[in-house]
């Protein structure tokens, strides 16, 4: 959709032998779906030429033509995200939803009205598989929902060995394990930011799906450090995480900076290595790292850098940062970042696309932007997730949270989950800590 302030608009689209014009008397251009798909097919590995003309009074104004590059590599067919008001501590209706990438159809994965309007958060998928996922239910009817095909479990992850229930997840590629951080989180109004979210304690553990047990080592669960945001490498042999020296909170929030570290993991024995490597030193670089995510081919890591802390969505200086894991060199992908917040991000299953959260439109609401990533790590210009109506986002009073690509449609299992929540969850236990 193209919008031009209610004026009459004419748009000419060209690619190879395909050429057509779309007229819009009200200024809202709606391109027919079949014609659009034919145009993209013709323009693969090439570009679409777009010429826009607008009628003002008796005159026509014609803009310079622009070219839209069209990649050969497909994007995954579905995008999953949470929709939530960008408030402080209260909520009413929230849910996890999915959107078809070849249409404007949005359907429900789970809405909190099924469980007395509790908090629903932290959805995660194993290898972009729509049939292997998890998310948390908080407050009333609490637990962690674990889905594996037709099998659904609810886990009670509060134990006497941990400081809280399981929090930020990341699946091992085998599906046998899930890394979680365990966070004691606080939210407060802040003198310089709209709000500030921080941890007063946090650890990292790895959960064994088959045994309902979890394990950790002192380096990942210590009172001397805050450890969070774990993620596995694509081969499953390394665990990345963010860590900072423990300090008095909130007094030291402005000085709290997280480094990016890595420890080896043996999936056969379920054990960790003894050596910890630092990939990004917060003290040396003057930045704090969040959300480390490795591309499916293992070549690049995308993360978020901000001035301090561990909740960058409220920090306008938060930017995406790309590390070449082969050379160890990192840089800011300029095409992705803006003058406002860039935060959570995830890769497509083929590693050629990223989707990320940004507040660049109005500084208030988080919207999903999508960008192409070449095999050399170079990024294309991001575009906002398209909607059927040009003014859709202007009227949407909710933020997009945790956008994740998946390779198919997620089955709605809401009633089954509700029954499990009423029955209570399976207790998990500690095997090594």
Whereabouts are the PLM-identified features?
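Sequence signature of WD/YWTD-type beta-propeller architectures
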Residues: 2-433
């Amino acid at each position: 959709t193209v919008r031009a302030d209610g004026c009459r608009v004419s748009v000419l689209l060209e690619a190879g032998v395909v050429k057509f014009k779309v007229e819009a008397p009200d200024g809202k251009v709606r391109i027919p779906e079949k014609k659009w798909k034919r145009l993209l097919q013709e323009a693969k590995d090439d570009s679409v030429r777009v010429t826009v003309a607008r009628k003002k009074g008796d005159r026509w104004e014609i803009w310079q033509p622009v070219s839209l590059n069209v990649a050969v590599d497909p994007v995954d067919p579905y995008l999953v995200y949470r929709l939530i008001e960008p408030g402080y501590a209260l909520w009413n209706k929230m849910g996890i939803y999915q959107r078809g990438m070849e249409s404007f159809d949005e359907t429900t994965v789970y809405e909190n009205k099924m469980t007395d309007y509790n908090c629903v958060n932290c959805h995660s998928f194993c290898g972009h598989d729509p049939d292997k996922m998890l998310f948390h239910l908080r407050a009333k009817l609490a637990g962690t929902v674990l889905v594996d095909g037709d099998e659904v479990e609810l886990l009670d992850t509060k134990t006497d060995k941990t400081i809280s229930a399981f929090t930020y997840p990341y699946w091992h590629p085998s599906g046998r394990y899930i890394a979680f951080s365990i966070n004691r989180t606080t939210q407060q109004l802040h003198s310089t930011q709209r709000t500030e979210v921080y941890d007063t304690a946090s650890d990292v553990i790895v959960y064994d799906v088959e045994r309902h047990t979890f394990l950790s080592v002192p380096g990942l669960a210590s009172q001397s450090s805050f450890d969070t945001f774990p993620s596995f490498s694509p081969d499953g042999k390394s665990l990345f995480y963010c860590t900072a020296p423990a300090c008095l909170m909130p007094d030291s929030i402005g000085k709290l900076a997280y480094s990016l570290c890595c420890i080896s993991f043996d999936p056969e024995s379920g054990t960790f290595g003894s050596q910890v490597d630092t990939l990004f030193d917060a003290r040396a670089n003057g930045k704090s790292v969040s959300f480390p995510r490795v591309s499916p081919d293992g070549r690049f890591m995308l993360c978020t850098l901000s001035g301090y802390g561990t909740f960058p969505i409220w920090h306008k200086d938060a930017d995406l940062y790309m590390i070449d894991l082969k050379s160890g060199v990192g840089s800011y992908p300029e095409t992705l970042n803006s003058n406002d917040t860039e935060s959570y991000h995830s890769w497509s299953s083929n590693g050629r696309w990223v989707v990320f959260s940004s507040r660049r439109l109005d500084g208030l609401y988080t919207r999903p932007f999508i960008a192409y990533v070449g095999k050399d790590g170079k990024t294309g210009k991001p575009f906002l997730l398209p909607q059927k109506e040009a003014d859709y986002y202007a009227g949407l009073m909710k933020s997009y949270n945790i956008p994740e690509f998946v390779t198919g449609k997620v089955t709605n299992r809401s009633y089954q989950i509700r029954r499990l929540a009423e029955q209570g969850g399976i207790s998990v236990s500690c095997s090594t800590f």
